[in-house]
Amino acid sequence: MSNFYEERTTMIAARDLQEFVPFGRDHCKHHPNALNLQLRQLQPASELWSSDGAAGLVGSLQEVTIHEKQKESWQLRKGVSEIGEDVDYDEELYVAGNMVIWSKGSKSQALAVYKAFTVDSPVQQALWCDFIISQDKSEKAYSSNEVEKCICILQSSCINMHSIEGKDYIASLPFQVANVWPTKYGLLFERSASSHEVPPGSPREPLPTMFSMLHPLDEITPLVCKSGSLFGSSRVQYVVDHAMKIVFLNTDPSIVMTYDAVQNVHSVWTLRRVKSEEENVVLKFSEQGGTPQNVATSSSLTAHLRSLSKGDSPVTSPFQNYSSIHSQSRSTSSPSLHSRSPSISNMAALSRAHSPALGVHSFSGVQRFNISSHNQSPKRHSISHSPNSNSNGSFLAPETEPIVPELCIDHLWTETITNIREKNSQASKVFITSDLCGQKFLCFLVESQLQLRCVKFQESNDKTQLIFGSVTNIPAKDAAPVEKIDTMLVLEGSGNLVLYTGVVRVGKVFIPGLPAPSLTMSNTMPRPSTPLDGVSTPKPLSKLLGSLDEVVLLSPVPELRDSSKLHDSLYNEDCTFQQLGTYIHSIRDPVHNRVTLELSNGSMVRITIPEIATSELVQTCLQAIKFILPKEIAVQMLVKWYNVHSAPGGPSYHSEWNLFVTCLMNMMGYNTDRLAWTRNFDFEGSLSPVIAPKKARPSETGSDDDWEYLLNSDYHQNVESHLLNRSLCLSPSEASQMKDEDFSQNLSLDSSTLLFTHIPAIFFVLHLVYEELKLNTLMGEGICSLVELLVQLARDLKLGPYVDHYYRDYPTLVRTTGQVCTIDPGQTGFMHHPSFFTSEPPSIYQWVSSCLKGEGMPPYPYLPGICERSRLVVLSIALYILGDESLVSDESSQYLTRITIAPQKLQVEQEENRFSFRHSTSVSSLAERLVVWMTNVGFTLRDLETLPFGIALPIRDAIYHCREQPASDWPEAVCLLIGRQDLSKQACEGNLPKGKSVLSSDVPSGTETEEEDDGMNDMNHEVMSLIWSEDLRVQDVRRLLQSAHPVRVNVVQYPELSDHEFIEEKENRLLQLCQRTMALPVGRGMFTLFSYHPVPTEPLPIPKLNLTGRAPPRNTTVDLNSGNIDVPPNMTSWASFHNGVAAGLKIAPASQIDSAWIVYNKPKHAELANEYAGFLMALGLNGHLTKLATLNIHDYLTKGHEMTSIGLLLGVSAAKLGTMDMSITRLLSIHIPALLPPTSTELDVPHNVQVAAVVGIGLVYQGTAHRHTAEVLLAEIGRPPGPEMEYCTDRESYSLAAGLALGMVCLGHGSNLIGMSDLNVPEQLYQYMVGGHRRFQTGMHREKHKSPSYQIKEGDTINVDVTCPGATLALAMIYLKTNNRSIADWLRAPDTMYLLDFVKPEFLLLRTLARCLILWDDILPNSKWVDSNVPQIIRENSISLSEIELPCSEDLNLETLSQAHVYIIAGACLSLGFRFAGSENLSAFNCLHKFAKDFMTYLSAPNASVTGPHNLETCLSVVLLSLAMVMAGSGNLKVLQLCRFLHMKTGGEMNYGFHLAHHMALGLLFLGGGRYSLSTSNSSIAALLCALYPHFPAHSTDNRYHLQALRHLYVLAAEPRLLVPVDVDTNTPCYALLEVTYKGTQWYEQTKEELMAPTLLPELHLLKQIKVKGPRYWELLIDLSKGTQHLKSILSKDGVLYVKLRAGQLSYKEDPMGWQSLLAQTVANRNSEARAFKPETISAFTSDPALLSFAEYFCKPTVNMGQKQEILDLFSSVLYECVTQETPEMLPAYIAMDQAIRRLGRREMSETSELWQIKLVLEFFSSRSHQERLQNHPKRGLFMNSEFLPVVKCTIDNTLDQWLQVGGDMCVHAYLSGQPLEESQLSMLACFLVYHSVPAPQHLPPIGLEGSTSFAELLFKFKQLKMPVRALLRLAPLLLGNPQPMVM
């Protein structure tokens, strides 16, 4: 019988049995695919998947060939999660035919298809692989780089890779692949051996057989191998041995296992990157070209890749080589090679040449692996075979270049060769497993020998290599690792499933529902029908444990049978099984702790192997015990426990602890059946006595024992404590005391058990676990369970101080007397007392208390990896209270002692990585240091909440400190810990990719549908309504800028007008109004700049340009197309272009846009082509055009549509600003004849496209001072007209464009133009500006300019009218901000009448502007400075425009003077606009506003005709633009009024150009809806000069002086500068007060300014810091002296700055003056604070739901609950305190303290932990470090109420003193003198001892208390015990023999 019993008990029950069918199989049938039709035709499904017993085809991963019927295969892995997320589900990759199906489980839902792929040819293999995207190719870089997770699908000729992000790659394979493996670095390929390569006698050198590919875009390179030889030297060579097959590859550690088919041995190699010296060896070696003999000396591994040598190739075209690559090899080899290789088309060969990761010369890897007997090294071919292929520049590769190998394998271990090595003993399955103590084994299954070979390996001490140990053989038919619990499942030949840990056998696995095969062979007994028949009773558990010893053998092979017989008997056993029915055929797909079993009938089941322990307490204790025991014993201990725990019908969660205690104590030698507190353990955890297992009955008649048993059961305790029982007043039926004396005689320990010698060590680590659990408030129940075990052990080990320690913690649980088990004194010698064992119990509370009191403490012992909280608490107290900063950077031994028995390298290493202190974050104070350090070690708010409140207090205090003034650059985790959600959300948003904005405005649908879309619906109205809250100016702007509605044509019909004439009159009026309508889109583009995130599936809406009108009173339509009046041709073409630009500029730069979407927006109708051209230009300006495919750009340009070319060229140039991008340069050069070689074909490029291309060159080369470009552009400014009418019209705009482009190329370089001195740039420009003789054209374009134009007779002088503007602005830009006086003097306005007559007045504007821009620092924002630019002669003689009579003087030309005057003033104003652009400078605004008003007055003056209205309008427009630049984005009301006034003027001189200027001014004023402003960087000024060029077009098609498209370049000067505070709780924009600090400059000192956000910030380079000011919001500081990157990223993401409202405060919207805030109210009635506070008002000042509910339920009286008013008042005042001091997290601490004091008053303290916490709180507030902090920060808010703590202290003192007076003194005396105590007094005594820090009685006798006569003597004696005086005062009466206690 016993035999059978043991067989049963060592069974391990598997759980969760489920039938398994691969998910992909089912999905395949429904997946749309031609192949699943074939699947249906093959056979019925049931037949299809069944297989005969031996073959096991299901899921086989053998090579699939096309001729066989379709096979399936699949693999499973653990679900891959995000960092920090714990997942427990499977992912499956299923392959059948051409399909690959990837499915995933999830925590919450069923398995679902994640991705399915269908490829063109049958899939040979599919696998997961992570590629590393790294610039740095070193080994170290691997940890930090981003990983691209891919799925790879191998077909016969190529491999497809699909990344999770959706990128697809395809790589053609240059050889037939036998197998592909994922590695840590990428993919590893094994080449198939072609038939002729196998004979070893072949004289030709073999090719490499293994190759690697590190990224889908990298090349396939050969693998190198480094094998150590006998003499210590090692060789490096290619892997060429065909006999060497990879059988296993692992990523961590990165090792490869190979099998040598010739020698029949397995070897292990480490896989790593090639070192550079190894590269050189291989490459040099291969270039020497040695003969095969001297190569063959180094074993069979020598190998070199071949490639075609030049002489071989009869083919001249480089591309033919690729397709006919094998044609040469036919001569040297059998044709079969050719037939086996995949044929690869030219396109495939070339496809990888375009990949960005490759050089110019690598077309494909294909030709390089070809065979040729000439050359020894892999070479790359040059592209051309001509003799001078390398002479024509560096564009081509050097003639041959070897392939550089990337990975290398290093030999680690080879199995020893035995004599009887069988053929084909290749491992069929290999895996790595570790045992329960973390020792690692590499296991490989040799199926032919039915053996599992396990090799132990470990890392060397320096972590550089792996050391392999001995091999252990386990007989096995199949095996699989169970990673989760560090074990492996082995299927024995007999069909048994056995669990091993490492090589130690744990036990058989019992699978419910499957017959156990072992019964037929080992037992003749019939098996019970159900597995749960024989439930073991509690009594024989110790027997059960004893019997385990015999079964758990350390030897892996059962000694019951002879191993030789084992092999013989296998087959006949199998026969017996088949008669029995199904048996297990194989094991596969292990994930976590789940495996699939394949059964003999073809079905599969998936089972779960139970975990080692489910309850946290048992897990922690097991970890601690495992940590302290020697490895062998630890494994045995865990195996025993696992067998008990996992037996069929194992324990429930509740009773697991009881089982653990029993098991552990039995292993220590206890007889748990005889021990009072363990004998009645309930192993079921049930509440019903019926189900509770009874003891085995000794007799039929029954006895009193049954009743005793019931009374002692847990069930009885449960019932007894039940409320019903109390209410019925049933007297407790006591169990008759288990006659203790019966037991106590013979309760001794059995010293022969496994753990007997280790009892002290186990006791000590369990004590440390106990102290650790005290730091987790959620583990209270576990502590009570653990303390019972510890007390028993402490008593038996006679450790008095420990028993006393537990008594003080749990006075009711720990009786001072109890059952003691004797340990034979003879045996105690065998006990191992470890060195770390201390006689004084380590106490974490005591340690913290001593630190707070400033006493020295010994280091606290801790278990690495187990007692992490203790470690954290100790170090944080040391840092914050003791102020020791060194410990965060290094492990400090002065506070902690790490307990070790063996050097556990692994754990230590992990720790040091975890606790490293990252110095990236800026910290100043100790509090900040503590918080940042705690975050770095992974401490979170949740951890803080589970710490007891007294221990957590110092940490909370530090957090409170940091919360006040945190740094803005702290990482998200720190901000979360200190409770600043505003900052953590900011940090979190900061990490997000630029996606849809936070403040995206959801436009309510239906608002715009009935009316036409005006292109302005997508603005963020929420923010705009905050910026301009007082009025409706935004609606007004929208009305002024809309062009989608018909205009009102108001014409009065005079009597003399006929109807026909009246219609003409109306249409003429409409034509006038249309000039204005066509000018609106430019301004609208400015207003809506970057305000919209398009939906990628919808086209961009472009509003209509409506040129019709409505005439009142009947609203009749007026149309220009009626034919009554002449309308200019192409009138609307540029207006449409601007409309397209405006629509495109709405798109924000952060939008998700791709090439397809851009093409998708292309209109169907030709008339919309102009709009699309504008749209393309806009996409360039916001940076999206770079995504447009080159092919599409080419398509658009070849269409020859002029506008599209202009838009595209300007767009791509703006997108590539300043990059000197070669491809764009080529694109532009085609359109600029001057950049083409002189002999090239003359292309017919439209003039405007040339202008756009020239400006484009300027943009692409901006600021580069590129000599050739500058030279060409300089010449182009003065390019003369040609003979055949080319370059004869609109020359001015081309010359200007060349000047602007030259200025951009040399932007701000001034006189530092390196290498251009011979060009004389400034002199040449000066000549262009003032005129003179034309210089002779030099260089290659000389020919072009020989014959002059036949139309334009300029002679050989420069036409200044053409060249002056461009040259002037070029000078301005080259010398921008250089303050170069000499150049500026060239630009001074002429000061004599004679000279004035030589200069067009318009050019004086440009000269003045240029001069001021050069003398940047001299510009002053006042009218005096503006006037100072006007020469004296003009100032003195200029007429005042308001005068009636004109002074007459013959010499002076009044017209010239007055025109010169206004233009110079306008030029100075414009420069003022540039200087203060976007600054909202008040002086500049006032000055410019005054001049604008003046010009408006001049216009209506009687003698305006002298100056000319057109000139005055121009100057007014220029001044208005300057004003708008200064106030850009601010929406200033006065400027808006000016713009609105000018909008209404439509007649007379008001042409298209002036309207354009006025509406651009309006757009600038509301730039980007108030979110953008202008920058004054050099680049911005260049862009603004192009956009605001002060010569406006006369009509809508006028591009003579300036190309209209350039007006949109202002975008390059716009930058986001709006800061929008967003309330983090409501997520809505709000007002907040900012304090902005300006850096000091030469004009002003460092100053501070207060702004109410949302507001536009000044330019960031002017600022020092920005601060969100209190008191309403939490303060927040952004320090710009550390760099502006942080703020720039905030501004670019819509400027969202999260802010958090402080408690008791209302937002500025609700309470503008701050009179309603809570603090304002309390100041008014300060005297009755707590009473004045009504709980109802709390909702006004906090949004925390927990606080609101607290106020609702705890602070208001409720019916029938009878709470005392006193408690309600207390709660209300505490709540008020917490909320006003911003410490809501302290509320639980306040309440816990109050509850503890009340419990103490009722004398119901069953445990003293809360009293400890109160004691720690009081000690913290009286600690020295805290007092110092208060002195340093007197203004700091109080962290805990100063009135609350003294009351607490006083109440406790009173309660304990009262207890002393009513008999407590006798109790204390009895305790100190070691006499027995009264049961009822135990808990109060413990409270007294803890609170007053009374030492244990063991410490008292040496002092001799009784002899003391005076208090002074006592004081002296107690000094060394560090006992507080207040405690001594209470003890003195007892010790001095005075009965009256002294109460103070």
From Swiss-Prot:
Residues modified to Phosphothreonine: 291, 537
Modifications the protein undergoes after translation, according to the UniProt entry: Phosphorylated. Phosphorylation on Ser-355 occurs specifically during mitosis.
Amino acid composition bias (Polar residues), ranges on this chain: 998-1007
Start and stop residues of the PC repeats: 1297-1325, 1366-1404, 1467-1501, 1520-1552
Keyword set, alphabetical order: Cell cycle, Cell division, Dwarfism, Ectodermal dysplasia, Hypotrichosis, Mitosis, Phosphoprotein, Repeat, Ubl conjugation pathway
Keyword S-adenosyl-L-methionine included in the entry's annotation: no
Compositionally biased residues, Low complexity: 323-343, 384-394
Region named Disordered: 305-343, 373-396, 994-1016
One Pfam family hit: Apc1_MidN
Modification Phosphotyrosine occurs at: 571
An example Gene Ontology CC term for this record: cytosol
Phosphoserine PTM positions: 51, 60, 202, 286, 313, 341, 343, 355, 362, 373, 377, 547, 555, 686, 688, 916
GO MF term list: molecular adaptor activity
InterPro entries per the UniProt record, alphabetical: Apc1, Apc1_3rd, APC1_C, Apc1_MidN, Apc1_N, ARM-like
Record Gene3D superfamilies: Leucine-rich Repeat Variant
UniProt entry tagged with the keyword Cell cycle: yes
Metabolic or biological pathway, per its Swiss-Prot or TrEMBL entry: Protein modification; protein ubiquitination
GO aspect biological process, one term: protein branched polyubiquitination
Family as reported in the entry's similarity comment: Belongs to the APC1 family.
Quaternary structure annotation from Swiss-Prot or TrEMBL: The mammalian APC/C is composed at least of 14 distinct subunits ANAPC1, ANAPC2, CDC27/APC3, ANAPC4, ANAPC5, CDC16/APC6, ANAPC7, CDC23/APC8, ANAPC10, ANAPC11, CDC26/APC12, ANAPC13, ANAPC15 and ANAPC16 that assemble into a complex of at least 19 chains with a combined molecular mass of around 1.2 MDa; APC/C interacts with FZR1 and FBXO5.
Pathological association: Rothmund-Thomson syndrome 1: A form of Rothmund-Thomson syndrome, a disorder characterized by sparse hair, eyebrows and eyelashes, juvenile cataracts, and poikiloderma, a genodermatosis presenting with mottled pigmentation, telangiectasia and epidermal atrophy. Additional features are short stature, dysplastic nails, and skeletal and dental abnormalities. RTS1 is an autosomal recessive form not associated with an increased risk of cancer.
Function text: Component of the anaphase promoting complex/cyclosome (APC/C), a cell cycle-regulated E3 ubiquitin ligase that controls progression through mitosis and the G1 phase of the cell cycle. The APC/C complex acts by mediating ubiquitination and subsequent degradation of target proteins: it mainly mediates the formation of 'Lys-11'-linked polyubiquitin chains and, to a lower extent, the formation of 'Lys-48'- and 'Lys-63'-linked polyubiquitin chains. The APC/C complex catalyzes assembly of branched 'Lys-11'-/'Lys-48'-linked branched ubiquitin chains on target proteins.
Name recorded for this polypeptide: Anaphase-promoting complex subunit 1
Gene transcribed to yield this protein: ANAPC1
